Amino acid sequence: MSDIVVVFHSGYGHTQRIAQAVAEGAGAQLLAIDADGNLPPGGWELLAAADAIVMGAPTYMGGASWQFKKFADASSKVWYTQGWKDKLFAGFTNSAAMNGDKLATLTYLWHLAMQHSGQWISLGLMPSNDKAAKRDSINYVGGYGGLLTTSPSDASPAEMAKGDLETAFAFGERIAQVAAKG
């Protein structure tokens, strides 16, 4: 079994709920970036030992949260030594609007993985894009490069769409399958 770590920031609990579903599907460890943009003790060592790093951030104002960006900037010490070279990476984001410019955040996560000379794992699921599709369908938001989820601004984390949570779990399973291939 591969060591997979889901590192994420969540401002209101929605991105955390997605992170938990991805981690459950992947059999991964969760690593939360705190409200000040810091990892807990041992966090950098956990990432160094991982075979795959899954990154998650909410989309705020067209990009990742500042707390996630602080973590990303701090990873430049790892970049300098190419400590994450050839690791597997994947990413996810959540926003209140259906589009919400989530692709900008996902692209940011991809760029960060590329800076670290990593290999990216796509979502690997077809979108639910026919007339029969419902909000609780798998990959209703229609991501390809990574997981995109939507939480209405007045919805609590407990009210998240079942389809988004199931898509997150399936994404985690895919990450574990790719990581197992070595």
Predicted regions mapped to residue ranges:
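Generic structural "secondary-structure junction" signal
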Residues: G62-G63, D86, N94, L123, ...
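N-terminal beta1-alpha1-beta2 submodule of the flavodoxin-like/Rossmannoid cofactor-binding fold
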Residues: M1-W84, S153-G182
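Gly/Ser/Thr-rich helix-start
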Residues: Y12-H14, A57, G63, D101, ...
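Short glycine/proline-rich, acidic loop/turn segments that cap or connect secondary-structure elements
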Residues: K134-S151
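Short, glycine-/small-residue-rich phosphate/pyrophosphate-handling segment
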Residues: L88-N139
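Glycine-rich phosphate-binding loop at the start of an alpha helix
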Residues: T107, G143, K162
